[in-house]
């Protein structure tokens, strides 16, 4: 009882401190119009949680973005993917706000970025600034909203991070007064999972999925099981759906599991693959949140009982399960179902594999001419691994099969494959390829002492290939370049992938961005209209093969 009281007091203190911090921060809206969200913090995504709020920009780009509080611009990043263009503002309260997918920065910052890009002849850049360089006040316009990088439509991606650790924290408590939400989360599916070799559901060792509308369907289990739920949240004023902030599971009125998405460290992002049913996601695209914590999953937002969320069914009686779903605004929905304890045989677990990946140790998997190193905690539970090698002595390298089924790997693992033959003397032309049927994808790689070495974070079939084919360059709308100055190229490489590119007009470097394989001029106003020009474009792939073309317009 005393421990429960101490825990309650501690939680109360933490919540009070957080509420005080929110009140003291007093952030303003980044926009001068009423805001709606297209995504919330913690929304489940492939391989990561959504780390901020996506704010709608009324379907257009170019909306002025206001700094949410006093501070200074500490960083500006320009990428082809990801956030595209992002601006970071460090605040005196220990937080940094991040504004992603912007189309441009405030004039003084934009000029600094452009100066760097032209001086270094590069589009991609990551610039850090000191406190006195670009101070900003609450409400200052720091950028214009856009659709840059990996964005599916115009919006602002707004993050809050702890300045010292880089930890992502949920911005919703700071901005919920600007939003309206009277809608409770909605579940769609319940999963009941037997732990293989220790439990059984309806006579088999496979999961049982129940639609929310079919929860009265009889389910019989014995031994150790756990459950999961698929659910979405909704808000007023939009048709979008969002991630569920808090999921709590009770069994016979005792809490056995809770997940609350209020903070995530960068290294925890891919641990989402141990929280969700990764096999179901990759096979059907359905997102089911497990109410179970694998032994190797260190994700802090998961809170489980001493059995990591597992429930032992060892009596022939009804076990009462109850899910409580809650959003940031206190809207709550409950789902209840019964699992009937029924004594039944539990099949022995016999994985069809010749190797194992253990979650709590470094795994070194070797075959003749191949080595894979999977560090500790890079799988979330012990995983069967089927290994094999195929091919004949005439190949550059054997095909190596590293089959762990639909199992996620936490981060990059070292993979080395030895060369059996070198049809091309230039060692920079070799790369490791992952393949499945007709699908092939370059994993990159560097040559060292007869081996090609790279890093991979998914398993499958790997080999070595050679790339001596240069990239392709195709002009788009060349006939209108002189008048429109909308200069674009389609570039692609079928082997190792695009490595770099540069464009010069009349002998001077011109800035181009790359999105979805299209090179697009960034400063068309720098190209004089209506006069002849000579353009030179070079594209180099990851193995150093280069294509150079000249155009007159």
What do these predicted regions represent?
Residues 231, 325, 537-539:
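Conserved structural position at the C-terminal beta-strand
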Residues 228-232, 416-420, 486-494:
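Short edge beta-strand/loop segments characteristic of extracellular beta-sandwich folds
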Residues 96-131, 206-216, 243, 250-311, ...:
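Exoplasmic/lumenal beta-rich domain surfaces
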Residues 312-318, 456-458, 524-532:
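Surface-exposed, short loops/turns at beta-strand junctions within beta-sandwich domains
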Residues 346-359, 385-431:
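Proteolytic processing hotspots in large secreted/extracellular or virion-associated proteins
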Residues 326-331, 540-545:
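Short, solvent-exposed loop/turn segments at the edges of extracellular beta-sandwich modules
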Residues 406-460, 500-502, 509-510:
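Proteolytic-maturation and junctional protease-sensitive modules
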Residues 19-97, 103-105, 122-132, 137-138, ...:
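Surface-exposed, glycine-biased beta-strand/turn segments
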